[in-house]
């Protein structure tokens, strides 16, 4: 299911796969024509939420580049929501036209697979986070969460990580963690640089 402006719609299908390491990935693929019809009736500024249930290692929402472009033209906001957090961004921040140029001018937007995912960080990134915490003198109260946006066509992939507007990432505070002990959230770049 996909939620548009707070109303649940049947416009997505979920699939869970397990890799050789036993890590599960749950992917919700949005039905382009169904979502297009729903958005046409909503006007501009709609919020499209892709809720992903379960405790998968990776939770991802997938749309076509054409759907992202359509959402962009309608000033829509995309939200991927999981048990560990949410990723909220205006569709325009994916900048699908620039991505398309990087993938090749002959690539149709409908052939570009846009994936917004929330996952546990890799072992190497977890080590980077732990080192950054040690160097910065802060304590990790909640497990780190990795947020990524990729756009792919065939074997080519473009990572989207720079934005011109505010992009919201939230982390759920697990049971047993005292929220009064949490001062701030910190972004840790792959090189170990931290930002508040």
Question: Predicted regions: what is each one?
Answer:
Residues 191-196:
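Surface-exposed loop/edge segments in extracytoplasmic proteins
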Residues 20-184, 189:
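Proteolytic processing hotspots in large secreted/extracellular or virion-associated proteins
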Residues 1-26:
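Ser/Thr/Gly/Pro-rich low-complexity, disordered linker/stalk segments of secreted
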